[in-house]
């Protein structure tokens, strides 16, 4: 289901790649030249498939394994900002949370925007990188990897082929994978000049149905791993229903999906774009269908990939793309291992494999090799065994062995206590916090104690945020949902709800969540900070633009001030206000509203009691505001996707780049607020078109202020996730400081120590 996938969870795998694959934190010059004779056991999500290649890993768990073995060109910092100047011995120092941190990278990247609209990305890598097998890395390895990702038959998870790289379209032209040609031609095709009739029949009767079933199974597995505990899922049918389809098993789910999309797999709103959890349908096909078929002429190389030295290259794009820089965090993978060195000759347009045939690369998928902090040794019985790489660029890890063990959600905390694992990342809420407190010998009232004799808990901001949305087409005055009167109506309601956020979010989360005031996750570098000029608490000014609250006000006084300010907004919206109440509504306005919330039908949601309180207060001044608690999350999603919800409570996922197009642009695919504002659209496009981060941050703040002025979204909370470690076995002092979703416990794995 589109919203469930994209809004709540799809970014998790990407984040893990960025934080684990670029394990480049504090520089360690050795000290203890021999790795400590210790083994660290870390939990990993169930779903290992043994596909550990940096090119073809599919599941989140497999991708994480690849990240420990592979060295990437550069990491992102604690706010997800690429580290582009960290190659030198002194690294690159950046401030976070009032502290300076130094980041190291395998390569530097310089970005230059040209007057003609083209962009140069000049990359220079270190000349002392050595793979764990002793061979030396050069820029040819990076070029090899680029051509793997950009091959016409590439069917992994990377999407570099969608970027505006000069000459890419010409290179990929004239060849297509067999499955693509068969799919486009259709089941009734009669032209068998490029394939046989038997091949076509086999594709439609066996190949595609089997791939579809595997695709559906990947969704089921993804849902059960990530959401079984939160949603009380017990069977595959439960997972299928949560994703929004019918069926008792994967085959039936695929039939339901295929029917719902009328067979549209590759369209902009097709199955691959909308439903994929961690892989596309095509990634599930038999390899026989991925072979490249020549259909015409094509370029021999990609003109925008230019080798400029043994350790440098330039990538040229035809225009600026804000996501391009993140895609350049590339694996430095040995071409001689993953490809064929005899097939590499840059000057003669040979790039380590035969164009259209990636079989040699895929043959190494189960046994990765790289220059990362650890060396792959084995995978069996749900455990990946890795050993310290003495040739690692930042120094040999102090932990000799790292075991990554599949662990169910229910066994993560108990596993750390029992000693079967040392580090885990369980889902986090007050019940889990109380479980951890009990294991540490604390009382239930001491659940906010994070450090104990058995377990240490490190909280990390969740890559996303909770919010309340408003449909302006249903909460308006007259026929214009964007008139000042309509805005004031929505602002009045938001003012009432906003003042209670601190109290009710704290009562649900304690100090494991914080109130936010802009529609963006605090994890983003673009998020306004309280110290920034012009920072404001959401809906804290009255209809005349004056502050509603003062620092001296008590909580009760703030509540009273909010009601007074809200009445001012309602009056400006055309309501009749007398004796502290709305006594009459503008013509055509009923002043009866409902908020949709997915609290399981039991009220278990961080915003449920807040919405109930809002209904009570609004009711006391003449406005009906009721809460509708959905037992099934899919039903909630449907209400705001189909435009029937007036108000709803949900959560957005956050991407590494803060691009606002999808959610707020007039043409955004998930613009559920139906905003169509030229000024806002222009700001969003300006933000997309610049590499200047301070400029983009200012642009996005202006855009967010427009959104808040429309009164269509009330930012609510930034919640936390957690990492739980054994206090008895792990040296907690060697963890990275100020961990974030982008810089987790493994970001400086080479300096982590056991006791």
What are these model-derived regions, one by one?
Residues 155, 202-217, 221-250, 254, ...:
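Extracytoplasmic/peripheral linker and loop segments enriched in polar/acidic and small residues
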Residues 364, 382, 389-439:
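Ligand-site clamp/hinge motif
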Residues 48, 60-67, 317, 321-322, ...:
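Detector for C-terminal structural segments
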């Amino acid at each position: 289901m589109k919203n469930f996938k994209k809004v709540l969870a799809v970014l998790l795998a990407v984040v893990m790649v960025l934080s684990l694959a670029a394990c480049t934190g504090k520089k360690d010059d050795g000290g203890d030249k021999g790795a400590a004779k210790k083994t660290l056991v870390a939990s990993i999500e169930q779903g290992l498939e043994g596909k550990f290649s940096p090119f073809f890993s599919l599941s989140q768990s497999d991708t994480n394994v690849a990240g420990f073995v592979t060295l990437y060109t550069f990491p992102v910092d604690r706010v997800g900002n690429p580290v582009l100047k960290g190659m030198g011995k002194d690294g690159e120092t950046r401030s976070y949370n009032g502290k300076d941190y130094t980041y190291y990278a395998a390569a530097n990247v310089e970005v230059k925007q040209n007057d003609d609209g083209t962009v140069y990305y000049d990359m220079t890598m270190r000349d002392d990188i050595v793979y764990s097998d002793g061979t030396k890395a050069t820029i040819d390895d990076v070029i090899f990897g680029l051509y793997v990702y950009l091959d016409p038959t590439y069917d992994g998870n990377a999407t570099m082929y969608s970027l505006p790289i000069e000459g890419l379209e010409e290179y990929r032209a004239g060849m297509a994978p067999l499955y693509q040609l068969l799919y486009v031609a259709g089941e009734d095709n009669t032209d068998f000049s490029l394939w046989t009739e038997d091949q076509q029949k086999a594709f439609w009767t066996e190949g595609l149905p089997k791939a579809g079933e595997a695709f559906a199974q990947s969704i089921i597995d993804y849902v059960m791993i990530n959401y079984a505990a939160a949603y009380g899922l017990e069977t595959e049918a439960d997972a299928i229903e949560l994703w929004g389809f019918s069926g008792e098993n994967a085959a039936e789910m695929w039939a339901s999906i295929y029917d719902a999309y009328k067979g549209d797999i590759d369209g902009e709103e097709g199955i691959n774009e909308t439903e994929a959890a961690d892989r596309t349908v095509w990634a599930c096909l038999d390899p026989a269908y991925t072979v490249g078929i020549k259909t015409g002429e094509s370029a021999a190389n990609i003109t925008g990939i230019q080798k400029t030295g043994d350790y440098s290259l330039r990538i040229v794009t035809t225009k600026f793309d804000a996501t391009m820089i993140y895609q350049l965090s590339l694996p430095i993978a040995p071409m001689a291992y993953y490809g064929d060195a005899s097939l590499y000759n840059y000057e003669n347009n040979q790039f380590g494999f035969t164009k259209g045939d990636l079989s040699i690369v895929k043959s190494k998928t189960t046994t990765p090799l790289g220059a990362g902090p650890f060396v792959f040794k084995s995978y069996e019985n749900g455990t990946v065994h890795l050993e310290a790489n003495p040739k690692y660029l930042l120094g040999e890890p102090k932990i000799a062995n790292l075991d990554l063990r599949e662990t169910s959600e229910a066994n993560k905390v108990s596993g750390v206590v029992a000693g079967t694992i040392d580090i885990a990342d369980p889902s986090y809420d007050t019940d889990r916090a109380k479980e951890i407190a009990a294991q540490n010998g604390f009382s239930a009232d001491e659940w906010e104690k994070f450090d104990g004799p058995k377990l240490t808990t490190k909280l990390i901001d969740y890559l996303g945020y909770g919010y309340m949305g408003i449909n302006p087409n249903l909460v308006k005055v007259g026929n214009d949902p964007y008139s000042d009167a309509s805005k004031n109506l929505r602002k009045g309601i938001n003012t009432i709800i906003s003042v209670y956020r601190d109290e009710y979010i704290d009562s649900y989360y304690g100090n494991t969540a914080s109130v936010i005031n802009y529609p963006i996750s605090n994890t983003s570098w673009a998020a306004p900070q309280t110290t920034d000029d012009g920072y404001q608490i959401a809906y804290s000014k009255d209809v005349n633009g004056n502050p509603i609250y003062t620092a001296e006000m008590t909580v009760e006084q703030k509540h009273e001030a909010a009601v007074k300010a809200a009445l001012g907004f309602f009056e400006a919206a055309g309501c009749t206000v007398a004796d502290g109440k709305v006594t009459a509504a503008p013509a055509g306005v009923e002043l009866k509203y409902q908020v949709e919330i997915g609290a399981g039908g039991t009220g278990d949601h961080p915003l449920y009691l807040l919405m109930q309180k809002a209904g009570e207060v609004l009711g006391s001044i003449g406005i009906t505001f009721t809460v509708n608690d959905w037992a099934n999350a899919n039903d909630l999603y449907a209400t705001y996707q189909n435009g029937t919800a007036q108000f709803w409570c949900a959560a957005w996922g956050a991407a590494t780049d803060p691009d606002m197009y999808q959610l707020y642009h007039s043409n955004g695919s998930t613009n559920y607020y139906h905003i169509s504002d030229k000024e806002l659209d222009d700001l969003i496009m300006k933000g997309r078109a610049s590499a200047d981060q301070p400029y983009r941050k200012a642009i996005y703040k202006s855009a967010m202020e427009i959104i808040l002025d429309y009164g269509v979204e009330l930012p609510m909370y930034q919640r936390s996730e957690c990492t739980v470690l054994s206090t008895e076995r792990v040296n907690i002092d060697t963890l990275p400081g100020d961990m974030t979703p982008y810089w987790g416990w493994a970001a400086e794995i080479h300096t982590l120590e056991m006791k």
